[in-house]
Design a protein with these regions (language model features):
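Cap/insert and terminal regions of metallo-dependent hydrolase folds
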Residues: 158-250
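Active-site environment of divalent metal-dependent phosphoester hydrolases
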Residues: 71-77, 95-96, 129-131, 153-156, ...
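Structured catalytic core of nucleotide-sugar glycosyltransferases
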Residues: 28, 71-74, 121-123
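Conserved beta-strand hairpin/beta-sheet module of binuclear metal-dependent hydrolase folds
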Residues: 2-56, 133-150, 162-163, 172
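Active-site metal-binding motif and surrounding structural segment of the metallo-beta-lactamase
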Residues: 48-93
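Short, polar loop motifs at secondary-structure junctions
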Residues: 47-48, 71-74, 91-97, 110, ...
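Metallo-beta-lactamase
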Residues: 89-142
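Divalent metal-coordination and catalytic microenvironments
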Residues: 34, 70, 121, 150, ...
Length: 260
């Protein structure tokens, strides 16, 4: 009898296990899946739909929605394919730019509340070089997660977060090195300053945030030329005193809710 009860308890715990799966996190394409056994939420539409379906083990029926932050191709290129199957939340600017129509498109307003299955979602403005949002995402099995990519400044800070996905794109040290070696155009520096978050900017954002309940920090959208993953992780861990990871394609991170 005790063995049966333990088996049932284990099955319940497994069904509540919430995982973050990284499909892509760079200028080549961005996509993440938040999922447990019964529900999934897709973040970004920058990866081929076939690869998304494969990452879901072909169980697309459990997908409750897809969130897109902005119009750039590495985040929205495949929005037509995904929005043909799933409710897709994005700024109207994204739908207009991509020329997509359909009854599963949900134009969002920053600050408004949305729900996809048991996922509760609030978009908020982020400063990029095109209209852009971040998302607060809450689920009973996960707690609250902040997803903030492709920005150089954000006017908001949030409390009661358990999980943070935040851009940490470059540092001046590696950017200058890449420019001097001819791997990066000098003009790119001016664009980066007004479009993407540097390592110091990431540290400043975290230092001015309430991290008291944060379980982990995931660094996303690192530049292939202007960053150093190991160095960035160490800098954030030393400063924020939280376990820190880099969103490599194929990575899976446990983001199950914890209780103090």
């Amino acid at each position: 009898m005790l063995q049966v009860l333990q088996l049932i308890m284990n099955q319940i715990q497994d069904s509540r296990l919430m995982m973050l799966k990284v499909l892509g996190s760079s200028s080549k394409g961005n996509c993440y899946i938040i999922q447990n056994e019964s529900e999934a939420l897709i973040l970004e539409a920058g990866i081929k739909f076939q690869d998304v379906k494969k990452a879901l083990n072909w169980n697309i029926a459990k997908v409750k929605g897809c969130l897109v932050t902005h119009r750039h191709g590495d985040h929205s290129k495949y929005i037509k394919d995904l929005s043909g199957c799933f409710y897709t939340l994005a700024l109207q600017d994204v739908f207009d730019y991509r020329g997509v129509t359909g009854n599963k498109l949900v134009p969002i307003t920053p600050g408004s509340r949305y729900k996809c299955g048991n996922f509760k979602i609030i978009p908020f403005d982020a400063h990029h070089d095109v209209p852009c949002v971040g998302y607060l995402i809450d689920h009973p099995d996960m707690g609250t997660l902040m997803f903030l990519t492709d920005f150089y400044e954000c006017d908001y800070r949030f409390s009661d977060l358990q999980h943070i996905l935040i851009e940490c794109n470059y540092s001046d040290k590696y950017l200058v090195e890449a420019i001097n070696e001819g791997r990066t155009f000098a003009r790119q520096r001016d664009r980066l300053l007004k479009s993407h978050l540097s390592l110091p900017g990431c540290l400043e954002f975290l230092n001015t945030s309430d991290l008291s309940k944060v379980k982990e920090i995931v660094l996303i959208h690192l530049s292939s030329e202007n960053s150093n993953a190991d160095e960035f992780v160490k800098a954030v861990e030393d400063d924020a005193r939280k376990p820190t990871y880099v969103a490599y394609p194929g990575a899976e991170i446990d983001i199950t809710r914890t209780y103090d």
